[in-house]
Amino acid sequence: MSFVEICLVLATIGLLLFKWSTGTFKAFEGRNLYFEKPYPFLGNMAASALQKASFQKQISEFYNRTRHHKLVGLFNLRTPMIQINDPQLIKKICVKDFDHFPNHQTLNIPNERLVNDMLNVMRDQHWRNMRSVLTPVFTSAKMRNMFTLMNESFAQCLEHLKSSQPIAAGENAFELDMKVLCNKLSNDVIATTAFGLKVNSFDDPENEFHTIGKTLAFSRGLPFLKFMMCLLAPKVFNFFKLTIFDSTNVEYFVRLVVDAMQYREKHNITRPDMIQLLMEAKKESKDNWTDDEIVAQCFIFFFAAFENNSNLICTTAYELLRNLDIQERLYEEVKETQEALKGAPLTYDAAQEMTYMDMVISESLRKWTLSAAADRLCAKDYTLTDDEGTKLFEFKAGDNINIPICGLHWDERFFPQPQRFDPERFSERRKKDLIPYTYLPFGVGPRSCIGNRYAVMQAKGMLYNLMLNYKIEASPRTTRDMWESARGFNIIPTTGFWMQLVSRK
């Protein structure tokens, strides 16, 4: 083949790829919907897809440019989505007319074991059945028992911190990457509360559960690239029978749960963890659950809890070191709680009574939302109208919907001075002024996160123990502008969550 022929072949392939990459970009033509010009392959998500900005920043900036439109077209890579910018319309779609938008965006990975059986991926009646069974698992009574397991992990974390190397001889302070610490904590909490396994990743960071668990975080590395390919070219991804996660690692968690269930049934053992609660739920359910369906509900902890719970603690600690007056007020509440407990470990009920802690965490979830957006899928044709009955838009079955959570959270019309960390927004006096459907830290409607209590419980427990023993200060390596330095799906600075802990004793 001559050089000219090779060039022609390459040019043809390039042209076909370009045509394919832009093949969905006419989706909004003739639908009376404003949209910004998308880039080939990357749509309106170029900066986050290329790791130039966080997904939160990308969505927030897009929202700011288009918020004067109640609805706007958005291209998430090649996928056309209809973004809802108006809180009242969000209520209509996600709550009032939920039956038209009951599912999340389709994630079609037939070769991926467990993923399709997770609650947040399930659809229609299958999801409804599983949701009704799992909802009692996350009640206060069940969380109260599970909190005792978390306390063991908090204690292990504090022991590890006590052995940390001081900055200099005679100093009572040391520097650490809070993200590394909290990832280990999240790992151990998930191990004990979801999988019935006791591990100590502080003393043994190379333990099997931690080593394999880290491979399931798809917000970075090879899993991130595979996930992007799955979204960008699902047919190609499935044609080659690719998977996001290594099948050997997935099998490890399957065996862990199945073996634990068999052992407990054989020896009549009970433990207040997720496996036990699922075993009890299975007995009461009319559905014949498969082992994979049970394992998948434990497996989801790595998707919904591992990174998110760790990030919630990190972002809150970051704001506390930047706002020492808020940190001092929180410390006073923590001391009062400790005195009321008379030296006993923190309990679930005592954690619930810490109102200022609630305010601090709520504001952290507002400013540094764990999820940049929520999504829905239109199940049947739907005419969207305003309160006066005026037609706004015609949705078609198969339309993907985007709810810009971080955009709403940073909108000064709803949260004045949104860049300011102000827990008072969530005080008893002021939280009644919040506009409904503008604060959505765990999603909205029946499809909202079922494990929100679990996430807040872990954050409260860790922050209580941290504040009780240490003052959090900035270190030379502390990120100055997290909004600009964060990358990927989560708010994680590229340099890490470095800070300094100063012992209070």
From Swiss-Prot:
Write down the required cofactor(s). Answer: heme
Which SUPFAM superfamilies does the protein's record reference? Cytochrome P450 (SSF48264)
Task: Kindly state which keywords UniProt assigns to this record, in alphabetical order.
Answer: Endoplasmic reticulum, Heme, Iron, Membrane, Metal-binding, Microsome, Monooxygenase, Oxidoreductase
The text of the family note is: Belongs to the cytochrome P450 family.
InterPro entries per record: Cyt_P450, Cyt_P450_CS, Cyt_P450_E_grp-IV, Cyt_P450_sf, Insect_CytP450_Detox
Q: Which GO terms describe its molecular function?
A: heme binding; iron ion binding; monooxygenase activity; oxidoreductase activity, acting on paired donors, with incorporation or reduction of molecular oxygen
- Localization (cell): Endoplasmic reticulum membrane; Microsome membrane
Transmembrane intervals: none
Q: Which gene encodes it?
A: Cyp9b1
Query: Lineage from the top down?
Result: Eukaryota, Metazoa, Ecdysozoa, Arthropoda, Hexapoda
Primary role: May be involved in the metabolism of insect hormones and in the breakdown of synthetic insecticides.
Name recorded for this polypeptide: Cytochrome P450 9b1
CDD domains for this protein: CYP6-like (cd11056)
Where along this sequence does the record place binding of heme? Answer: C449
Q: How does it sit in the membrane?
A: Peripheral membrane protein
